[in-house]
Regions:
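Non-transmembrane, aqueous-exposed alpha-helical and coiled segments at domain scale
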Residues: 1-455
Length: 455
């Protein structure tokens, strides 16, 4: 079977798909009748309580006179405000990814020796099995780097003599190896695709033990391995801001769900990758960049507030860009007044825009940040406030770093693997039951019909 035949949607498939859709549609009123929390969230977007965690805390409300009201968002890793963590390692002129990974896994900020030893351990694990690049990554490269990453993770199972051992020491070893290997798996997969599909020169850099994770990403990706200190610093901050966001986000909850079945680490992380790949989860920053590229073509004067506002209204009316009715990068399931990750990001983003000569683009982003919340509030029925989220600026950062769009979501995964690892360890340590929520059957009982009597 050739590739085109494999991918073909025949008239029979279209017909059967319509039958399937008709059989599966559920009257939306029934969800209200049976008080189903669709998406495991209530009408205000608050998640149903499904578990407990030490790892992080997402705060977006405060209590005033006994009433919960929206507040500026805060994010805590193991009890530490992320804002303080970022200020701490940047003021100390350190890279933070390894330090904060240590915190997430062990509930402790490392001292200098502990941090040095941990970095050395991650560096030791930053090496793929012999011939893995040639035999696995270079064969049948996918156009989607998240699929490539998931395939590589699942294949590593075959190289692990203790792949199915779910004891905590073994799982920690596997998680640390995957944290170290994600940049290599993602970037090598991208290089292979560019070579075989786009005809570009193939270059494979080896990781360098003296470099941080952020520095290694830029070193591995760029042909000349060069980068500025500000570029590496901002990518490191991006990794820290994306590495964890509670146990209820889709990929971390997937990690808990699949871990609860006591399957192996590679299967768990591959499932989390599949979750993060979805455009409702990890792919949003790509949409932000694409939306702004369309905006820059459609809006003649980027400084004209009325013209920019009109474009944003057209987005909401499904009359611009992808006609989805969304302003990408604005709004969040939990945060309403502000996303702390976006707030932290913005000052560093402005510095990089100055270094790259992209001040006009930054000014346009800032203008949309100011206009969009009010326009959404005027145009839509809102149950809570709305503000920009971390995706709003992260795509712009990756664009300024000349990172290919195909790697935007894998870079999210390079960060979030630390959070997934912490959640997997937490689920195993507490030895909970397999996660199995209820689904209410609403179909009618039927009497069996012999095949000769069916119509």
């Amino acid at each position: 079977m050739d590739h085109n035949a494999f991918s073909e949607i025949t008239p029979d498939i279209v017909r059967l798909a319509k039958m399937s859709e008709q059989a599966d549609i559920i009257n939306s009123e029934l969800f209200t009748k049976y008080d189903v929390k669709r998406g495991l969230r209530d009408l205000n977007g608050k998640g149903v309580l499904a578990g407990l965690t030490h790892i992080s805390d997402v705060r977006a409300t405060e209590t005033v006179n006994g009433i919960s009201v929206p507040a500026h968002g805060e994010l805590f890793y193991r009890g530490y405000n992320v804002k303080d963590l970022v200020e701490g390692f940047t003021s100390g002129n350190r890279f933070g990814f390894e330090e904060v990974t240590y915190l997430l896994l062990f509930d402790k900020l490392p001292d200098e020796k502990e941090l040095t030893d941990f970095r050395a351990l991650l560096s030791k694990y930053r090496s793929l099995p012999t011939s893995f690049v040639r035999d696995i990554i270079m064969k049948a490269p996918s156009s989607d780097m998240m699929n490539t990453l998931a395939r590589s993770v699942l294949t590593l199972y075959s190289y692990d003599d203790r792949a199915d051992d779910v004891s905590l020491p073994n799982v920690l070893r596997q998680c640390l190896q995957l944290i170290s290997l994600f940049p290599l798996l993602s970037i090598y997969g991208y290089q292979a695709y560019c070579h075989y599909h786009d005809g570009k020169s193939l270059f494979i850099h080896q990781s360098l033990p003296e470099l941080s994770t952020a520095e290694n990403i830029l070193h591995l990706l760029r042909p000349d391995s060069s980068y500025t200190p500000l570029e590496a610093k901002l990518l490191d901050i991006a990794l820290v801001l994306h590495m964890e966001h509670g146990g209820g986000n889709n990929s971390s909850f997937t990690t808990h769900v699949v871990t609860s079945s006591l399957t192996d680490t590679y299967s768990v992380i591959a499932a989390a990758i599949g979750s993060l790949k979805g455009p409702r989860h990890g792919g949003a920053n790509i949409k932000v960049v694409q939306m702004f590229e369309d905006m820059k073509k459609e809006v003649k004067n980027w400084e004209d507030e009325d013209e920019v506002a009109n474009y944003l209204k057209r987005l909401l009316h499904k009359d611009a860009f992808d006609h989805a009715g969304l302003i990408y990068g604005v709004g969040h399931a939990i945060y309403s007044k502000s996303d702390p990750r976006a707030v932290i990001f913005k000052s560093y983003v402005e510095k990089l825009s100055e270094e790259k000569g992209l001040q006009k683009e930054f000014a346009l982003y800032s203008l949309v940040e100011r206009l969009a919340p009010q326009i959404i509030s005027n145009e839509r029925q809102m149950y809570k406030g709305v503000s920009i989220n971390v995706d709003f600026y992260s795509g712009f950062v990756y664009h300024m770093l000349d990172l290919p769009m195909q790697l935007y979501t894998p870079i999210f995964a390079m960060a979030r693997i630390s959070g997934w690892a912490a959640h997997r360890m937490e689920e195993l340590a507490n030895n909970g039951k397999i996660i199995r929520p209820a689904y209410k059957p609403i179909g009618e009982d039927k009497v069996y019909i012999n095949i000769s009597d069916r119509k």
